[in-house]
Amino acid sequence: IERAIVEHNVTLFLLCNPHNPVGRVWTEDELKCLGDICIKHNVIIVSDEIHADFVWDGHTHTVFANLGESYAEHCIVCTAPSKTFNIAGLQVSNVFIPNETLRKRFVKEIDKAGYSQLNTMGLVGCQGAYEVGGPWLDELKVYIQGNIQFTLDYFKQYLPKLRMYRPEGTYLMWFDCSQLPLTADEREQWLLYDAKLWLDSGSMFGKDGETFERINVACPRATLVEGL
């Protein structure tokens, strides 16, 4: 990472934690290592933590700004209630910028772009979701973990040629189709027109993802069973 930052004169690093699509939850040590590199080269880290509420047993989410003052001064943390509470339609998100100078620059730019005003419904919905949505979220997480385990068991029993990875976080599951005798395009055509499934092709995440597919298991179990 450091070599790439230097060679390409990087000034801003986009971090996804928990990671979409592979489901990694970066450890505190990993985040500090990245932070030290970025601080050394004066790189701002934009930490996309939109799936932070979906971190599974044995793993802990660390807010990048909470690593320490020096890390906080070099970061922008982005969250939203849309994934957690399924309210993307309210079009509201949260941007935390501890560095006052950087925050003023950000506010100036969104004012220029015409995005300085939140819609009232979005603001009320966001506040209400975080204030009273905890019990609902607790139940949801149990349900989604059940879907994750069901999917892992199903792939192991019925789809042994497809390697399914257990996510450390998010409700998105990532599986490898490299043992299938199909190109990425052939696989997409088969899934869409024969299986009648519209998954997310790994190709959209770059060349290294061409043999992969992503599936969203945050749905009713009956829907998941039908799709599988």
Kindly label every feature range from the protein language model.
Residues 5, 38, 68, 155, ...:
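A generic structural signal for well-ordered alpha-helical segments
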Residues 6, 71, 181, 190-199, ...:
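PLP-dependent enzyme catalytic core of the Aspartate aminotransferase-like
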Residues 104-111, 129-152, 183-184:
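Structural signature of PLP-dependent enzymes
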Residues 120-123, 127, 142-152, 164-177, ...:
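Conserved glycine-rich beta-strand-loop-beta hairpin in the small C-terminal domain of fold type I
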Residues 152, 161-164, 198-203:
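A short linear hydrophobic-aromatic micro-motif
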Residues 67-105:
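Active-site PLP attachment segment
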